[in-house]
C-alpha cells in the first residue's frame, strides 16, 4: 500500500471516528433532551407546545403579570375542561389544576387519598413544627388536640370575644384621630388592620400575661401628630408614621412578612429560610428570643395548672390539654419540646396575616358598594335598637349571639370573592379525580375562581357548570360581582335568613385539614364589621387608590387598602 493510500486510510479512519463520536454525542444530547422533557399524565389536557420544551409551562407562568391563580384559571378556560395539568419543567411532576369545585369538593371531603400539600409545606419552612406544616399523622393530631378548647363557644364568647371588642374600640379611636388629623382624607388601613389582628391574636394566646397593646401605642403616637406637617401621597392621601412596637410584636410582624416573601421567591425556599433563621443579623436573634419568650409563658401556664387555677389564656388551655394527654398516655408532658413552642408561634403568625387580609377586603367592598353598606347599617341599627337608644355600641356578647343574616351574607360573599384562590392537596396514593387517574405524589390545585365565574363562560362545559351552581338567594348571575343577596332566603314565616350551606366555601380549606381558626376569624370579622359600620360611613377614595389587584402568599392580600371615613358619632 502506497504512502498516499495509507494517509487516505488514516484520514478516513479519523473522520469516521469523529463522525461516530459526533453521532454518539448528538444522540446522547437528544436523549438527554427527551429525558428532560415534561412527562404529562395520560388522559388530562395539557399545553402541547409546553410539552416540547424542557421548561414546560414555567416560562409562560413566570412572565404572566396576573399571577398564579389567574394563570391557572386561564389554562382551564383554554382547555374548556374542569381539569388540566401544568408542566413544571425538568424532573418535576405535572401539577393538576381542578376548577369544578362543586364536584371536586365532594370528592375530596372525607377522603384519605388527599393530604396537606408539600407545595405549601416546602414554602413555609420558618413555621418549624407548626401543625400547618405537617402531613396528617400523630404529630399533627397531637398539635390540633392542644387547640380544641380554644374553639369552644365558652372560650370564644367569654375570652376571645371581649378581647376582640376591646381591640376594635381602640382601632376606632385610632381612626377617629387619623380622620381628624388628616382632615377626613384617605389613608392606608392595611397596617392598622394588621396591628388589630396582632393585638387580638396576642391577647388570645397570652391574655393578661402580656399587657403591651400595639394599638395603644399607635393611638398615643397619632394623637401627638400635627396634621399640617403630615406628608401626602400622589392622590392627596395622608401618610402616617408608625409608633415602634414591642420587640416581640415587631418581630412577629416582620417574620410574617418575610414568610410571605419566601412563599413567592424564585430562590429555593429552604435555602432562603436557612439564611433568615441562622445567618441574618436582623432575624436570627428573634428566632432565639421567641423560643425563650414563648417558653416563659408556657412555664407560667404550667405553674397555674399545678396551683389548680382556672385556665385564662390560650397557652393555659394548650398546657392543660397536654397535661391530660400525657397522663392518659403514661408519658412526660412536652412543655419543653420545640413542637409546642412552634405551635404557639405558628398560630401567632398565621392568625395575624390571614385575618387582617380578610378585614381589608370587607371594608374595601363595603366602601365600593354603598347600597350594601347602608343596608347592613339598617340591619344592625334594627337589631341593636337597645344599644342605639342607650347611645352606645353593642357589646361583644350582643354581636356574637344576635341573628344577623345580612351581616353573615356580607362576610360569606367577601370570603367567596376574596379569600383562598388556590387550595393545594397531594395525592397520598394512586387515585381518581373527575374520572382521571391521579398518581401518588401528584399535587392537585383547586382553583376557587375558575372560568365559570366569568359573565360569559368560554365553553358549553363551563356554561353547564355555571348553570348548575345554585345559590340560595337570587343574587347577581355574574359571579365576579359582590352581591350578598345570593346567600339570603325567606323562611316559612317570611323572615330573611342566611343560608351558607348550599354551595361549597373553600375560604378556610376543606375536610380535616381545614383552618382550625375559622371560628375565631369569623368572630373577629363579625365584631369588627359591626362596630365599624355603626361608627363610620365608609366613603369612596380617589380613583388612583381604588382597585382590587392582589398578591397571593400566606393569604390573598389587596395591594391597595385605602380608606376614607366619616364619623357617625357615638351611634348613627
Curated annotation (Swiss-Prot):
Enzyme class name: oxidoreductase
Listed EC numbers: 1.-.-.-
Record has Methyltransferase as a keyword: no
Cofactors: heme
Pathway: Secondary metabolite biosynthesis
Annotated GO biological process: mycotoxin biosynthetic process
Gene: xilC
Binding site for heme: 515
Top-level taxon of the source organism: Eukaryota
Signal peptide (from-to): none
Disulfide cross-links: none
Function: Cytochrome P450 monooxygenase; part of the gene cluster that mediates the biosynthesis of the 6-methyl-2-pyrone derivative xylariolide D. XilC hydroxylates the 5-alkyl-6-methyl-2-pyrone backbone called prexylariolide D, produced by the highly reducing polyketide synthase xilA, on its side chain to form xylariolide D.
A Pfam family of this chain: p450
Family: Belongs to the cytochrome P450 family.
GO MF annotation terms: heme binding; iron ion binding; monooxygenase activity; oxidoreductase activity, acting on paired donors, with incorporation or reduction of molecular oxygen
Presence of keyword Iron: yes
Keywords for the protein's UniProt record, in alphabetical order: Heme, Iron, Metal-binding, Monooxygenase, Oxidoreductase
Protein name in the entry: Cytochrome P450 monooxygenase xilC
Cited InterPro entries: Cyt_P450, Cyt_P450_E_grp-IV, Cyt_P450_sf, Cytochrome_P450_monoxygenase
Amino acid at each position: 500500500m502506497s504512502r498516499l493510500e495509507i494517509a487516505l486510510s488514516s484520514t478516513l479512519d479519523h473522520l469516521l471516528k469523529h463522525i461516530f463520536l459526533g453521532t454518539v454525542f448528538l444522540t446522547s444530547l437528544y436523549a438527554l433532551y427527551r429525558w428532560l422533557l415534561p412527562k404529562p399524565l395520560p388522559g388530562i389536557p395539557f399545553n402541547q407546545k409546553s410539552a416540547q420544551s424542557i421548561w414546560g409551562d414555567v416560562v409562560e407562568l413566570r412572565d404572566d403579570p396576573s399571577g398564579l391563580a389567574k394563570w391557572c384559571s386561564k389554562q382551564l378556560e383554554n382547555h374548556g375542561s374542569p381539569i388540566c395539568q401544568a408542566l413544571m419543567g425538568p424532573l418535576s411532576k405535572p401539577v393538576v389544576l381542578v376548577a369544578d369545585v362543586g364536584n371536586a369538593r365532594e370528592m375530596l371531603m372525607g377522603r384519605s387519598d388527599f393530604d396537606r400539600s408539600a407545595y405549601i409545606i416546602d414554602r413555609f419552612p420558618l413555621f418549624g413544627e407548626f401543625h400547618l406544616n405537617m402531613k396528617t399523622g400523630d404529630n399533627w393530631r397531637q398539635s390540633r388536640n392542644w387547640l380544641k378548647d380554644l374553639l369552644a363557644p365558652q372560650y370564644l364568647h367569654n375570652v376571645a370575644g371581649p378581647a376582640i371588642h376591646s381591640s376594635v374600640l381602640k382601632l376606632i379611636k385610632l381612626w377617629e384621630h387619623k380622620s381628624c388629623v388628616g382632615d377626613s382624607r384617605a389613608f392606608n388601613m392595611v397596617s392598622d388592620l394588621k396591628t388589630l389582628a396582632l393585638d387580638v391574636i396576642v391577647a388570645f394566646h397570652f391574655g393578661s400575661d402580656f399587657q403591651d397593646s400595639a394599638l395603644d401605642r399607635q393611638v398615643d403616637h397619632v394623637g401627638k401628630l400635627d396634621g399640617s406637617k403630615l406628608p401626602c401621597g400622589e392622590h392627596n392621601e395622608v401618610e402616617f408614621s408608625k409608633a415602634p412596637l414591642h420587640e416581640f410584636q415587631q418581630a412577629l410582624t416582620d417574620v410574617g412578612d418575610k414568610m410571605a416573601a419566601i412563599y413567592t421567591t424564585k430562590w429555593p425556599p429552604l435555602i432562603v429560610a436557612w439564611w433568615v433563621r441562622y445567618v441574618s443579623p436582623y432575624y436570627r436573634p428573634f428566632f432565639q428570643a421567641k423560643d425563650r419568650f414563648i417558653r416563659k409563658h408556657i412555664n407560667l401556664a404550667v405553674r397555674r395548672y399545678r396551683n389548680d387555677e382556672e385556665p385564662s389564656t390560650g397557652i393555659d388551655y394548650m398546657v392543660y390539654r397536654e397535661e391530660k394527654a400525657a397522663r392518659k398516655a403514661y408519658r412526660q408532658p412536652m412543655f419543653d419540646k420545640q413542637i409546642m413552642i412552634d405551635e404557639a408561634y405558628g398560630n401567632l403568625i398565621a392568625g395575624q396575616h390571614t385575618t387582617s387580609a380578610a378585614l381589608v377586603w370587607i371594608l374595601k367592598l363595603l366602601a365600593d358598594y354603598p347600597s350594601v353598606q347602608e343596608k347592613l347599617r339598617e340591619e344592625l341599627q334594627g337589631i341593636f335598637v337597645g344599644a342605639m337608644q342607650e347611645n352606645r355600641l353593642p357589646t361583644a356578647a350582643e354581636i356574637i349571639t344576635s341573628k344577623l343574616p345580612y351581616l353573615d351574607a356580607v362576610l360569606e360573599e367577601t370570603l367567596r370573592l376574596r379569600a383562598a384562590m388556590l387550595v393545594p392537596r397531594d395525592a397520598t396514593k394512586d387515585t381518581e379525580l373527575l374520572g382521571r387517574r391521579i398518581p401518588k405524589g401528584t399535587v392537585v390545585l383547586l382553583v376557587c375562581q375558575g372560568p365559570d365565574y366569568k359573565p360569559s363562560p368560554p365553553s358549553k362545559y363551563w356554561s353547564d357548570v355555571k348553570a348548575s351552581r345554585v345559590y340560595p338567594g337570587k343574587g347577581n348571575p355574574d359571579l365576579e360581582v359582590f352581591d350578598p343577596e345570593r346567600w339570603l332566603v325567606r323562611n316559612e314565616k317570611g323572615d330573611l335568613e342566611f343560608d351558607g350551606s348550599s354551595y361549597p366555601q373553600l375560604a378556610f380549606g376543606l375536610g380535616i385539614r381545614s383552618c382550625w381558626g375559622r371560628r375565631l376569624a369569623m368572630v373577629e370579622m363579625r365584631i369588627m364589621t359591626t362596630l365599624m359600620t355603626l361608627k363610620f360611613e365608609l366613603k369612596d377614595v380617589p380613583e388612583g387608590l381604588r382597585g382590587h389587584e392582589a398578591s397571593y402568599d400566606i393569604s390573598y392580600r389587596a395591594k391597595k387598602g385605602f380608606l376614607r371615613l366619616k364619623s357617625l358619632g357615638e351611634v348613627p
